[in-house]
């Protein structure tokens, strides 16, 4: 519930005070350990955090679940000396604890499914045993203030104090803008160099960098948030520099101008005398389907050429019963796609659609046709 004016500011200030107090009780200074075969190295920690981020998307869980799992993992590794061979089991146990703490009951993954689909290399019973060890070491206290909690609070205070903050981003609502910052924060949480800062410092540095891009008076608002959070300005400057470095590396790693091309199944559209389409095998290669459908298809980068070869109209030949059954199944498949995109036209439009597509293909000389929705009857 959002309160108007001063009441909203008081509520946000109260949330910030409680979160900072909670963080002060839980947070421990990160002491870098000498990498050996007997303890978890910083790079191994970053790899397992990135793995948890992938699990978050795989099981369609909240960002808060990943943030809490990451915080629990760091708290546990700061308390005990863990062997690297147990790291996956520790991480998946923290992930399961976070899911049970944050998610709704129907969204919590089934333990057997989680152990199987995550490829963690441990059984359900091993996860439960490790879960009990983690709870004992953390004194059964899982409710800690995560960097994502502080990001929500700082962003709400900034938007409330500076309503013009998002004027330069008219297409983004405050929640959409927060989602962009959340994605950046989750990336920074997988960087062990930022473990030297509290979660509140990390969130404020990210909000401050974003305000610097959007409004000219970002510095007074940053100082105001800094005073409310009772932080050291020199640490904030150092944290801003590291966050800016890691975010610049993230932007440079993104693919440029990625184009996702949809190719239909291995069939060609052929016109018939009655104004209907027939499906025949084509040399156009369609997508390869394997047993593992969980992996996304690799995007095609740069100019991509594809054609729908439409031979000249000819008389429709009598097909066998098996061919008719196959055509009915494919027609049902395409009917489902048309209904999904609200392109379910009546049969009277078949001839006009055919003529339009033929003229478009004949008149377009470029090997790369414009990316437009294609209606397949």
Swiss-Prot record:
The family annotation for this protein states: Belongs to the cyclin family.
Q: CDD domains, per this entry? A: CYCLIN_CCNI-like
Entry annotated with the keyword Phosphoprotein:
no
Name recorded for this polypeptide: Cyclin-I
Check the record and name the InterPro entries matching this protein.
Answer: Cyclin, Cyclin-like_dom, Cyclin-like_sf, Cyclin_N
| Keywords for the protein's UniProt record, in alphabetical order | Cyclin
Compositional bias ranges of the Pro residues kind = 367-377
Gene, per the UniProt record: Ccni
- Report the PANTHER family cross-referenced here: CYCLINS
For the region Disordered, give the residue spans: 356-377
One GO biological process term: regulation of cell cycle
Entry keyword 4Fe-4S: no
GO MF term list: cyclin-dependent protein serine/threonine kinase regulator activity
In terms of SUPFAM superfamilies, this protein maps to:
Cyclin-like (SSF47954)
């Amino acid at each position: 519930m959002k309160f108007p004016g001063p009441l909203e500011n008081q509520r946000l200030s109260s949330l910030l005070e409680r979160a900072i107090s909670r963080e002060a009780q839980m947070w421990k200074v990160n002491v870098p350990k000498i990498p050996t075969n007997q303890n978890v190295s910083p790079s191994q920690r970053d790899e397992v955090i990135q793995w948890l981020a992938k699990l978050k998307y795989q099981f369609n869980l909240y960002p808060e679940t990943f943030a809490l799992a990451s915080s629990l993992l760091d708290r546990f590794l700061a308390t005990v000396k863990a062997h690297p061979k147990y790291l996956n089991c520790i991480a998946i146990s923290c992930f399961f604890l976070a899911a049970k703490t944050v998610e709704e009951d129907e969204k919590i993954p089934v333990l057997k499914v989680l152990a199987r689909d995550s490829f963690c290399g441990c059984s359900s019973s091993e996860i439960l045993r490790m879960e009990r060890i983690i709870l004992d070491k953390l004194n059964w206290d899982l409710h800690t203030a995560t960097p994502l909690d502080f990001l929500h609070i700082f962003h709400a205070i900034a938007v409330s104090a500076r309503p013009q903050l998002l004027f330069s981003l008219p297409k983004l609502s405050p929640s959409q803008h927060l989602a962009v910052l959340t994605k950046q924060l989750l990336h920074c949480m997988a960087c062990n160099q930022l473990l030297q800062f509290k979660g509140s410092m990390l969130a404020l540095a990210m909000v401050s960098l974003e305000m610097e891009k959007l409004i000219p008076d970002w510095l007074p608002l940053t100082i105001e948030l800094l005073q409310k959070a009772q932080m050291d300005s020199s640490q904030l400057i150092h944290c801003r520099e590291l966050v800016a470095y890691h975010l610049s590396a993230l932007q440079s790693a993104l693919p440029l101008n990625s184009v996702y091309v949809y190719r239909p199944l291995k069939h060609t559209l052929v016109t018939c005398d009655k104004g209907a389409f027939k499906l025949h095998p084509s040399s156009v290669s369609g997508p390869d389907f394997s047993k593992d459908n969980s992996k996304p298809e690799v995007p095609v980068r740069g100019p991509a050429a594809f054609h729908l070869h439409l031979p000249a109209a000819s008389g429709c030949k009598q097909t066998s019963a098996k061919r008719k059954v196959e055509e009915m199944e494919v027609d049902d498949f395409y009917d489902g796609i048309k209904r999904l995109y609200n392109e379910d036209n009546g049969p009277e439009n078949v001839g006009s659609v055919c003529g339009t597509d033929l003229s478009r293909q004949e008149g377009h000389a470029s090997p790369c046709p414009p990316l437009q929705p294609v209606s397949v009857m």
